[in-house]
Design a protein with these regions (language model features):
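Conserved phosphate-binding/catalytic region of the ribokinase-like
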Residues: 1-4, 170, 201-308
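Glycine-rich phosphate/adenosyl-contacting loop at the front of the ribokinase-like
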Residues: 1-61, 65-69, 75-76, 244-245, ...
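Alpha-helix C-terminal capping segments
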Residues: 45-54, 98, 260-265
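A glycine-rich helix N-cap at a beta->alpha junction
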Residues: 77-88
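Conserved phosphate-binding/catalytic loop of the ribokinase/pfkB sugar-kinase fold
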Residues: 86, 96-135
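Conserved phosphate/ATP/ADP-binding segment of small-molecule kinases
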Residues: 151-234
Length: 308
């Protein structure tokens, strides 16, 4: 039995670091180039796994070299994976630019991730795996209709559903009512709530998301920390003071860490603090999955560093 099931995307990331982003027609030399595994689903699954969670990852891969290499990589990491192989479609990939401020721009080639359709999960082994899990963790790099179906099934089975609405998109109230923890950044929160963030209306936006049906909202604010709020609970947490070199994968690391700590029976305060520390370590390193810390690294970091 896996306590955490992650369903989502897998990409091969092609990352270039540069002093600044080019404008149209401009050619720049990259300062650094790396190829690594990524995808929000894979990032979150690996984060939860490295940080002590018992994880099963379900993802859609092409029958190609990237798909084969991805499975070998997951095996080396010790991550339990149930791959859904699709023919004649390439595995997902992403081109990531990172500037000297640690900011990123990402262009996705969804490939097999867009083939992760409801028909692909109409299998007894997947339904049984959901039934045997405690926490279901999802993102938005697979089709919305698939995410909605999984949320519905998990909700009917009284599982804890965590949805990270990344990439940002609108959600209907039906799916919001199926979610136990809605994890969003400012851009994602604006899109769902319909309220523009002005720097001072965080609570207004969160309350709107709760009114729309979410049980608990976690609003991540980067270097300004995070807020976790429900009808019975309201916790604000500041961030760690670290020098960010690459924010790619920070949100995914946060989500995986939160799920991992929650699966161990930790209190919400502790899970939020642990996830914040894991994300803080992540942004000090280059790459998505290469930057995900181990559980020991996070525990040591929390002992030796204080929140702002």
């Amino acid at each position: 039995m896996n306590k955490i099931m992650v369903l989502g995307s897998t990409n091969v990331d092609y990352m270039m670091k540069m002093e600044k982003f080019p404008v149209a027609g401009e050619t720049l030399d990259a300062l650094e180039f790396k190829q690594s595994m990524g995808g929000k689903g894979a990032n979150q699954a690996l984060s939860a796994h490295r940080l002590g969670g018992d994880v099963l990852f379900i993802t859609s891969l092409g029958n190609d070299v990237n798909g084969s290499n991805t499975l070998s990589y997951f095996k080396d990491e010790g991550l339990n994976v149930l791959p859904l192989i699709v023919e004649n479609v390439p595995s997902g990939s992403a081109m990531i630019w990172v500037n000297s401020k640690g900011e990123n721009c990402i262009v996705l080639n969804p490939g097999s991730n867009h083939e992760f359709t409801p028909d692909l999960i109409n299998r007894p082994d997947i339904e049984n795996a959901i039934r045997d899990s405690e926490i279901i963790l999802l993102q938005m790099e697979i089709p919305y209709i698939t995410v909605k179906k999984i949320c519905k099934l998990a909700s009917e089975l009284n599982k804890i559903v965590i949805l990270n609405v990344a990439p940002a998109r609108e959600l209907d109230s039906e799916i919001l009512k199926m979610i136990d923890y809605l994890v969003v950044n400012v851009v994602e929160a604006e899109m769902i709530s319909g309220i523009d963030y002005d720097g001072s209306n965080k609570e207004l936006i969160i309350d709107k998301l709760l009114d729309l049906g979410a049980s608990t909202v976690i609003l991540t604010l980067g270097k300004h920390g995070s807020i976790l709020k429900s009808s019975r609970y309201n916790k604000s947490l500041s961030a760690y003071d670290v020098e960010a070199v690459d924010t790619t994968g920070a949100g995914d690391t946060f989500c995986g860490a939160f799920a991992a700590e929650l699966s161990k029976g930790s209190k919400l305060d502790d899970a939020l603090h642990f996830a914040t520390a894991a994300a803080a370590i992540c942004v000090t390193r280059m790459g998505a999955q290469p930057s995900i810390p181990s559980e020991k690294e996070v525990r040591d970091f929390m002992k030796n560093n204080k929140l702002n």
